[in-house]
């Protein structure tokens, strides 16, 4: 298995994504409507919107957990399904197996001499010294770091994040944001982050996409240097622009987004 530090340069590049005329309906309810989107290789994109707007459905389609009703999902010019081995997904829950030690959770499903790479992945997220502990001994933030290490060991070119920081306290959340941003800069994968937190979106993403009632309502480039100064006037202005647009959407209580049961075999961060 190739070490994270020894990846050939072409593997340090993210996957370019193209979403064309995408629709997703559950019965008579159309959740996504004619989504067209191009994401360059290595871009960090945050997807925001009210609950039930369709953002998590979009991520599930990109992850291959659901199939579009209409439209195409492409990795460059090839079907996105061809890039599943290069794709990893993280959820709000770390989904660690409590009967396996931390390092074994990172190497879950791998064969051969995977332990050095698992330890290297844990080192990348700052948890190498906890490798032989049980998940129950970890905090919520540490468990998410393990889930991130479990994704990194597979050298992903596309990382899909479905509100992985939503259950963390404010300080731990900022630390995890900074870690994800650092690793993204180091490894160059393409990132799509679904989040309810607009401040999080503008703080770490290159681009913020607002989903309104199943359509793209705003596509905002965050053209600010990194690392970004939290609380700066320019960052606050961008956050206000997105929030004002979100709050301008009629606030009738949305239906929860439908979803299909998870398949038995799933490449989340494992």
Curated annotation (Swiss-Prot):
- InterPro entries the record matches: AAA+_ATPase, ABC_transporter-like_ATP-bd, ABC_transporter-like_CS, ABC_transporter_ATP-bind, P-loop_NTPase
Which keywords appear in this protein's UniProt record, sorted alphabetically? Answer: ATP-binding, Cell inner membrane, Cell membrane, Membrane, Nucleotide-binding, Translocase, Transport
| Swiss-Prot/TrEMBL catalytic activity | ATP + H2O + aliphatic sulfonate-[sulfonate-binding protein]Side 1 = ADP + phosphate + aliphatic sulfonateSide 2 + [sulfonate-binding protein]Side 1
- Main subcellular localization, coarse class? membrane
Pfam families listed in its UniProt record: ABC_tran
PROSITE patterns, sorted: ABC_TRANSPORTER_1, ABC_TRANSPORTER_2, SSUB
Stated membrane topology is: Peripheral membrane protein
**Subcellular localization, as worded in the UniProt entry:** Cell inner membrane
Enzyme kind, highest EC tier: translocase
GO MF annotations, alphabetized:
ATP binding; ATP hydrolysis activity
Name the domain of life this protein comes from.
Bacteria
Annotated Gene Ontology cellular component terms: plasma membrane
Locate the ABC transporter domain: which residues? 17-238
Catalytic activity, EC: 7.6.2.14
Cite the Gene3D superfamilies for this sequence.
Answer: P-loop containing nucleotide triphosphate hydrolases
Residues that, per the record, bind ATP: 49-56
PANTHER family named among the record's database cross-references: ALIPHATIC SULFONATES IMPORT ATP-BINDING PROTEIN SSUB, TAURINE IMPORT ATP-BINDING PROTEIN-RELATED
Q: How the protein assembles, per its UniProt entry?
A: The complex is composed of two ATP-binding proteins (SsuB), two transmembrane proteins (SsuC) and a solute-binding protein (SsuA).
Q: What does this protein do?
A: Part of the ABC transporter complex SsuABC involved in aliphatic sulfonates import. Responsible for energy coupling to the transport system.
* Family in the record: Belongs to the ABC transporter superfamily. Aliphatic sulfonates importer (TC 3.A.1.17.2) family.
- The name under which this protein is listed is Aliphatic sulfonates import ATP-binding protein SsuB 3
Tell me the organism. Pseudomonas syringae pv. tomato (strain ATCC BAA-871 / DC3000)
Q: The organism's lineage?
A: Bacteria, Pseudomonadati, Pseudomonadota, Gammaproteobacteria, Pseudomonadales
Name of the encoding gene:
ssuB3
């Amino acid at each position: 298995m190739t070490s994270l530090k020894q990846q050939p340069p072409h593997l340090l590049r993210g996957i370019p994504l193209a979403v064309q005329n995408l629709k997703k309906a559950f019965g008579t309810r159309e959740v996504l409507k004619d989504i067209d989107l191009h994401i360059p290789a290595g871009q960090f994109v945050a997807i925001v919107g009210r609950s039930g707007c369709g953002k998590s459905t979009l991520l599930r389609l990109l992850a291959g957990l659901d199939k579009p009703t209409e439209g195409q999902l492409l990795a460059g010019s090839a079907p996105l399904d061809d890039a599943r081995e290069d794709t990893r997904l993280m959820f709000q829950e770390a989904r660690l197996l409590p009967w396996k030690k931390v390092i074994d959770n990172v190497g879950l499903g791998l064969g051969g001499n995977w332990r050095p790479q698992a330890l290297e992945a844990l080192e990348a997220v700052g948890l190498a010294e906890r490798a032989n502990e049980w998940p129950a001994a970890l905090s919520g933030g540490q468990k998410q770091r393990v889930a991130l290490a479990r994704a990194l060991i597979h050298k992903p070119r596309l990382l899909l994040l479905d509100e992985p920081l939503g259950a963390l306290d404010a300080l731990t959340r900022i630390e995890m944001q900074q870690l994800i941003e650092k690793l993204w800069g180091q490894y160059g994968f393409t990132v799509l982050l679904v989040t309810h937190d607009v401040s999080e979106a503008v703080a770490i993403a290159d681009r913020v996409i607002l989903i309104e009632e199943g359509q793209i309502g705003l596509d905002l480039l965050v053209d600010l240097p990194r690392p970004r100064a939290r609380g700066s006037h320019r960052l606050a202005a961008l956050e206000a622009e997105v929030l004002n647009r979100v709050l301008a959407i009629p606030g009738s209580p949305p239906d929860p987004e439908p979803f299909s049961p998870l398949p038995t075999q799933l490449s989340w961060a494992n």
